[in-house]
Amino acid sequence: VHASDAVTPAPRLVTTRCPICGEEGTDREVYPANFDPAALDSAVFSARRTPDRLHYRMVRCVRCGLLRSNPILPLEDLSRLYGASRFTYQREAEFTGKTYATYLRRALAGRPWPRSLMEVGCGSGFFLSEAARMGIEEVSGVEPSQEAIEHAEPRLRDRIRCALYDSETFEAERFDVICAFQVFDHVPDPAGMLRACFRHLRPGGMVLFINHDSGALTNRLLGERSPIVDVEHTALYDRSTMRRILEVTGFTVQQVFGVKNTYPLEYWTRLAPLPSLVKDPLLKALERSRVGELPVSLYAGNLGAIATKERPQ
């Protein structure tokens, strides 16, 4: 544990309520917590780290079926840990940005071309670079990790705010498109985040989200061994609960769909639920050869969602 960014020795965990139903006490336990909260540090909250199987107590809402963590660290601890997190995925960022740009093009098909776009949890701005290359005039981002922002292209750095996103981050009706990629399942108040997005979108604007799909076959088969069952994830959505949370926060859902990701073979191997005795030598072999750099496209248990803020009648 890094002394400078560890949680205090006896962290206070806070109870969560279902963000769809808005209630507490409608849950059944799915997995008990398996870690000591005092041992958490910023390395655990760094994006795309090698899975370590740590997770909160996870419960399922008996009303809507949403899988979520309960209880979790309070916002002030999460803010500090994400703020001090490391940017360790520069190699994958190029692949990731191109994948997300492909889905943005599809989402915009048949719609007026947007003038402005904002990304929540933009990291080093790798997707913002792609959006700018697509011809979107104004690109903006919000990112809690200062280290990630320092890796952004110089022309983008002043367009990225170092903060946790909320309703006061921007003025109302500022953007035509808001995107969040592998961010929504990390948010302690997901309904609040969606209400902020709704506020910051212009009428007729669109959100595009990509995140894990708890209902995907791979994740259902792996259960607690799935990489998505992780201490960073405050809630995990399937296609039904993703649609429902968008609808209860005012959005009109256009589409919820499966997502195909392209990454180097070495990255997929790092995520695979293999024993360390097998995974560690395999990763070393892939790093020594060029085989680990081969791009591989897979449906790997992610979903996408497109929803709009309808114009007033």
Identify the meaning behind each predicted range:
Residues 1-173, 177-181, 191-194, 257-261, ...:
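Conserved N-terminal segment of class I S-adenosyl-L-methionine
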Residues 39-45, 83-90, 222-230, 269-276:
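Short glycine/proline- and charge-enriched loop/turn segments
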Residues 182-186:
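A short His-aromatic
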